[in-house]
């Protein structure tokens, strides 16, 4: 803990870091993450499910004195939608904004900036031209990555080969869909036969 580290830092001839107040990251509906209680999702597991920019956005958009509720289920779609909306429509016209709106706009810009893995990159590159929701649908109805890329080319979402960012997003999406955290109400089932109820 921080308090235990203070004397150790001084013993080793260093100064302890400044104390920063922060709250817990909680798994939605499960309470604070705790290795002793088994309520955890490790960073590598989280990164195998969620694009790093969206995972960073979950943290960057939160106030440091409030706990972060990390929902690996259906709310992840809403978080991704929010991130994609802010990236696609950056705030430009600030002349007629109130002071409160200006603060909110600056906070949103800061959250997007801190969400980027490479600070020099264009945030729109992280989306790859395809929304999180649309990619989840394609990942479920197309069995191969090549079929997904063909579909995206036909629909005009991409031209030619997909970006590395989009390839990574699809791999993570397939991992999320195949894992325990994907929401049941977002799962698609393709039937091979027409049932009697559909006739």
Predicted stretch roles:
Residues 1-11:
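Glycine-rich, aromatic-lined ligand/substrate-binding cores of catalytic
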Residues 2, 22-195:
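Catalytic adenosine-cofactor/nucleotide-binding cores of aminoacyl-tRNA synthetases and other
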Residues 11-12, 27:
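Short acidic, glycine-rich loop/turn motifs
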Residues 12-13, 50:
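A broad structural signal for alpha-helix termini and local helix breaks/kinks
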Residues 13-14, 67:
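A generic secondary-structure boundary signal that marks alpha-helix termini
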Residues 15-19:
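Beta-sheet entry/capping signal
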